[in-house]
Design a protein with these regions (language model features):
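Long, low-complexity C-terminal extensions of enzymes
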Residues: 74-80, 89-169
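Generic preference for well-ordered secondary structure
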Residues: 10, 42, 54, 84, ...
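Gly/Pro- and small hydrophobic-enriched strand-loop and loop-to-helix capping segments
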Residues: 3-26
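Amphipathic alpha-helical blocks and their helix-capping loop/short-beta junctions
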Residues: 18-92, 96
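Residues at alpha-helix boundaries and the short loops/turns that link adjacent helices
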Residues: 2, 20, 64, 130-134
Length: 169
């Protein structure tokens, strides 16, 4: 599932929305002028943001910083958005999802990129050892069945496992 432009802006991954059909003219203007401020002159509304619309639900769900609790909370919701989120979460590697939640809880907006990359490297180097990456590749690219068989289930991911993945290399 791709993130929409409006969700990317809401989440802070993007600053502005530029429709693809305007790119050629905009690129020419930028090449001629070299003035990036033209990007801000006519902001275009990116449309509806599901993340913004469900901000409180997500904030409450992810407050626990524990994948099993997040899935449990979202599963009890009667929201279509929450049910869709649970289905997407369950398709992903439980260990990678848990690690991501832990990494985000260890970092803050004031963290340096080096800190984030260090944590990412720690996990990535160890994920190879446990076969999660290989299983994801098998399901997505080799067999294309889109049905990975994760060795570790959501309910068996422990804090100790995550800490092991994130210890210094």
């Amino acid at each position: 599932t791709q993130m929409s432009a409006s969700d990317a802006i809401f989440a802070g991954f993007a600053d502005i929305y530029i429709p693809k059909d305007t790119w050629p003219d905009l690129i020419k203007k930028l090449e001629r002028s070299g003035d990036c401020s033209i990007l801000d002159k006519e902001p275009i509304n990116a449309g509806f943001s599901q993340l913004a619309d469900h901000k409180q639900l997500l904030k409450t769900a992810f407050a626990s910083k524990n994948l099993l609790k997040i899935v449990d909370f979202l599963s009890r919701s009667e929201s279509k958005f929450a049910n869709s989120a649970v289905n997407r979460i369950k398709k992903n590697c439980p260990l990678a999802m848990s690690y991501t939640i832990e990494m985000l809880s260890r970092l803050s907006p004031q963290s340096k990129i080096e800190e984030a990359l260090d944590l990412e490297y720690r996990y990535t180097s160890r994920a190879q050892e446990y076969g999660n990456f290989q299983e994801g590749i098998r399901a997505a690219i080799i067999d294309k069945d889109r049905k990975p068989k994760w060795k570790i289930k959501i309910n068996s991911v422990s804090k100790e496992m995550i800490d092991e993945f994130l210890k210094p290399v």
